[in-house]
C-alpha cells in the first residue's frame, strides 16, 4: 500500500496526483476539527532563538490543565515521536498486545526496536456511543490501548481499564481524541499516572485544535521514564513556533475549556446528523461513534465509491486498509462543518445512485 493510504491528511500529494490545488480538496480523511484557533503573532525572537529544551512553560500549562505535577509531563514532536519512545520501553518489556483494527503507528514504532507484538482482536459490531467495557485481552507483557478507539470510535470505560494495570508490565494508552468527547475526561487514565509506574498516557493537540502541521503532543508518565526518553531523543524535538502556539492555546484554562465545549458540541451534533443521513443509503451501515469520525461498513468494496468521490467531487475519505483487521468494505469519515457534511452526503448520494451497493 502506498504511503498516502496509510494515514489521512495527505492533501498535498493527492492534489499533485489529481492536478489541482490542495485547497480544492475537502479532506475528511483526517479527523481534525474544521476550524483553527486564533494563533499568536510570531516574533523574530521565536524564530531566531533556540527553543527551551525543557519546555517548562508548556509543561506547566499542561500540568495545570490536568492537575498533575510538571514532572509527569513531556512534550513531543507530535504523538508519533512519543509512540516511538514508548515502543522502546515496550520492546524491552516483552510481547506487546496491539488492538485490531488499530492505528498502524503503534506497530511502526515497535518496528523501530524490533519489538514483538500480537493482535488483540476487537469486536467489529457494537452499539451505542457511551463508555463500554474494554474487551478482555490475551496474555502479554505490554498492552496498547486507544481511547476513544481509532478507527471505530468506541469509548472505553476507565472502570474496565484500571484493573488491567495490574495484569501488564506496561500499559500505553493513546488518548489523542478523548478531549473531543463530551465528559470524556471522566474516562481518562491520567489521574492514575502519579501512583502507577507502569502507565504511559499519550495525547496530541493536533486533533483538538486542528494544528497537525505543527506536530505537538505530550506524554504523561512517571518522571524516571520521561527522563530516559529525554536523554534518548534529539536535543530540540519541539520547535519554537509549536511551543509558542501550545502556550497560547493552553495558557488560559477558561479559554481552553470554552474551546473544548464548542468542539464537543460540534462533534455530538454533526455525528448524530451524519448517522441519520448515512443510515438511509442502501448497503451502507454507519457504526456508532463517540468521537468526531464515523466508520462505515458495506457488504462489498467501498474503494470505487472512495475513488469516485476523490476524482469527481474532490472529497477525500479515509481508506481503512491500513487498519489491521479492516478491508476494502470499510471507510472512515472525519466530521466537517454542516455545510461540508452536506457536500459529502450529496456526493455520496449521487455516486451511489450511479453504482448502488445493494
Feature-to-residue mapping (PLM):
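N-terminal "arm"/small-domain region of PLP-dependent enzymes with the aminotransferase-like
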Residues: 1-54, 61-64, 139
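Active-site phosphate-binding strand-loop segment of PLP-dependent enzymes
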Residues: 122-183, 295
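Conserved PLP-anchoring active-site segment centered on the Schiff-base-forming lysine
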Residues: 89-111, 116-123
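PLP-dependent enzyme catalytic core of the Aspartate aminotransferase-like
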Residues: 159, 311-312, 322-358
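Conserved beta-loop-alpha segment that forms the PLP phosphate-binding cup at the N-terminus of a helix
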Residues: 56, 70-94, 217
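PLP-dependent aminotransferase class I/II
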Residues: 198-280, 284-287
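Short, conserved charged micro-motifs
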Residues: 37-38, 301-307, 339-343
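Conserved PLP-binding catalytic core of the aspartate aminotransferase-like
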Residues: 267-268, 278-313, 335
Amino acid at each position: 500500500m502506498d504511503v498516502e493510504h496509510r494515514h489521512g491528511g495527505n492533501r498535498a500529494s493527492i492534489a499533485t496526483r489529481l492536478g489541482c490545488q490542495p485547497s480544492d480538496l475537502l479532506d475528511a480523511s483526517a479527523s481534525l476539527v474544521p476550524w483553527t484557533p486564533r494563533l499568536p503573532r510570531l516574533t523574530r525572537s521565536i524564530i531566531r532563538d533556540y527553543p527551551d529544551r525543557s519546555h517548562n512553560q508548556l509543561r506547566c500549562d499542561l500540568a495545570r490543565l490536568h492537575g498533575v505535577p510538571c514532572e509527569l509531563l513531556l512534550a513531543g514532536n507530535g504523538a508519533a515521536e512519543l509512540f516511538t519512545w514508548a515502543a522502546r520501553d515496550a520492546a524491552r518489556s516483552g510481547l506487546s498486545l496491539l488492538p485490531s483494527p488499530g492505528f498502524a503507528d503503534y506497530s511502526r514504532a515497535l518496528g523501530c526496536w524490533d519489538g514483538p507484538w500480537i493482535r488483540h482482536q476487537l469486536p467489529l459490531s457494537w452499539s451505542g456511543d457511551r463508555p463500554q467495557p474494554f474487551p478482555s485481552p490475551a496474555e502479554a507483557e505490554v498492552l496498547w490501548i486507544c481511547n476513544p478507539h481509532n478507527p471505530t470510535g468506541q469509548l472505553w470505560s476507565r472502570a474496565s481499564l484500571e484493573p488491567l494495570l495490574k495484569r501488564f508490565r506496561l500499559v500505553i494508552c493513546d488518548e489523542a481524541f478523548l478531549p473531543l468527547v463530551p465528559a470524556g475526561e471522566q474516562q481518562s487514565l491520567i489521574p492514575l499516572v502519579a501512583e502507577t509506574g507502569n502507565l504511559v498516557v499519550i495525547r496530541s493537540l493536533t486533533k483538538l485544535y486542528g494544528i497537525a502541521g505543527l506536530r505537538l503532543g505530550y506524554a504523561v508518565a512517571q518522571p524516571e521514564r520521561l527522563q530516559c526518553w529525554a536523554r534518548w531523543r534529539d536535543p530540540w524535538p519541539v520547535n519554537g513556533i509549536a511551543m509558542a502556539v501550545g502556550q497560547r492555546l493552553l495558557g488560559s484554562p477558561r479559554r481552553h475549556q470554552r474551546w473544548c465545549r464548542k468542539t464537543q458540541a460540534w462533534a455530538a451534533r454533526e455525528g448524530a446528523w451524519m448517522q441519520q443521513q448515512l443510515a438511509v443509503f442502501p448497503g451502507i451501515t454507519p457504526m456508532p461513534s463517540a468521537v468526531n469520525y464515523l466508520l462505515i461498513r458495506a457488504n462489498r468494496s467501498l474503494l470505487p465509491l472512495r475513488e469516485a468521490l476523490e476524482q469527481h467531487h474532490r472529497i477525500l475519505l479515509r481508506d481503512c486498509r491500513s487498519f489491521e483487521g479492516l478491508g476494502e468494505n470499510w471507510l472512515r469519515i472525519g466530521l466537517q462543518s454542516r455545510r461540508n457534511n452536506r457536500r459529502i452526503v450529496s456526493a455520496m448520494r449521487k455516486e451511489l445512485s450511479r453504482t448502488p451497493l445493494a
